[in-house]
């Protein structure tokens, strides 16, 4: 059982069509759903898009988990918020409807946690300018994501996410995880670039 988090607050890009693949957008720590929903304007129109507000108040916005440090979730907290998220997702997208996760920063760690916890549940995940949740109660063993589609984008000048976590995420997703990873590095910092958004759109379209 997870704590009594509020019912998820969501914003949709358009009317949800249950016959379309669902793309769930996950914002960064201290932000909310209203910022990241704009990314959907740059992504394929034949998908349904929904942005979800994280359940934990943090920094004038919201967070997906309690931290032991930037990019390092408290395992119990991550487990609780993932259970809360799945309680919301499963009625909306029963097994059989493709679901892709797109997470930025703290939302990337949350998306990674969901994928690592249950790789077969998701049609893919985009890890944007963030880290996977290592030592956070989800498996990061060799082959854990065998064949799973992953889009990975990092900024070479990112000063928000610790460099060791960025390197570890890059190495794992392009190596031991077994994921089918498309990866790019931008010269900039901790922000989604227009080039990354365009490549993400192409990646989503090719996996529909």
Per-region residue spans from a language model:
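Serine-hydrolase catalytic machinery in alpha/beta-hydrolase-like enzymes
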Residues: 2-95
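Short, proline-enriched alpha-helix->beta-strand connector loops that line the catalytic pocket
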Residues: 20, 97, 145-150, 179-180
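Active-site signature of alpha/beta-hydrolase-fold catalytic machinery across serine-
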Residues: 38, 113-117
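Flexible "cap/lid" loop of the alpha/beta hydrolase fold
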Residues: 61-68, 130-150
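Gly/Ala-rich beta-loop-alpha elbow adjacent to hydrolase catalytic centers
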Residues: 102-107, 111
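A conserved short beta-strand
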Residues: 120-133
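Short beta-strand/loop motif that positions the catalytic acidic residue
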Residues: 151-154, 158
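C-terminal catalytic histidine-bearing segment of alpha/beta-hydrolase fold enzymes
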Residues: 164-208
């Amino acid at each position: 059982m997870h704590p009594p988090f509020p019912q998820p607050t969501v914003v949709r890009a358009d009317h949800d069509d249950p016959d379309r693949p669902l793309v769930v957008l996950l914002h960064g720590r201290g932000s909310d759903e209203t910022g990241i929903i704009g990314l959907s304007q740059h992504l394929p129109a034949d998908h349904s898009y929904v942005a979800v507000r994280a359940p934990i108040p943090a920094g004038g916005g919201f967070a997906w988990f309690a931290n032991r440090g930037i990019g390092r979730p408290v395992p119990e907290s991550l487990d609780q918020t993932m259970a809360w998220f799945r309680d919301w997702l499963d009625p909306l997208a029963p097994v059989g409807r493709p679901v892709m996760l797109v997470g930025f920063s703290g939302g990337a760690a949350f998306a990674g946690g969901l994928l690592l916890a249950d790789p077969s549940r998701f049609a893919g995940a985009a890890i944007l300018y963030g880290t996977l949740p290592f030592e956070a109660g989800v498996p990061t063993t060799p082959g854990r994501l065998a064949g799973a589609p992953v889009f990975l984008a990092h900024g070479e000048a990112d000063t928000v996410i610790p460099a060791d976590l960025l390197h570890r995420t890059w190495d794992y997703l392009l190596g031991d995880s077994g994921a089918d990873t498309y990866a790019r590095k931008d010269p900039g910092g901790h922000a989604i670039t227009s080039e990354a958004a365009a490549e993400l759109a192409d990646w989503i379209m090719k996996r529909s």
